[in-house]
Amino acid sequence: MLVQQNYHNFPWIYKKNCLYLGMIKKYPKQFKKVSDYLKEKFGIDVLLGQITAFMGHKNKKIFIHHNHNLEKNGLYSLLHEVGHVLQTDEDNYFKTIDEDKEPKKFKFYQYINEINAWEKGLLFANELGIRVNIEDWVKVQNESLYTYSKKL
């Protein structure tokens, strides 16, 4: 079943088994399993869009870039964003740092936060029974972390 509910703030996105820019893209089994879990447990919708990001517990949305392969880097990116969902206030310490006053400290703890989200995402995958090719996982993780390490 395909749901085509329009998001007013995001006119290019439709919900669930996803109509995106006129193209229907059904979620693969493992991606859907994670998406369904997030909806049931946290009320979080997983949507395809122009970015990959967890929009926060208030907005209850995770966007995965529409060009991602939802069986590989898209799934791993989703699991990483689940890692952010599972983070505690302590894990998000960098958000308490004034980036203008202490930019190096902010960027360092932001980098640590990203590593933590990857770790939590992998543990979550294991708990939910999601199959992960560890070599592919590490490749996607390292590509992502590299973008943060350049800021250090």
Model regions and ranges:
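Short secondary-structure boundary/hinge segments and terminal tails
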Residues: 55-57, 95, 143
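Charged/polar positions on well-ordered alpha helices
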Residues: 85, 116-119, 123, 127
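Short alpha-helical catalytic segment bearing the HExxH-like zincin motif
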Residues: 73-81
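Post-HEXXH active-site segment of zinc metalloproteases
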Residues: 88-119
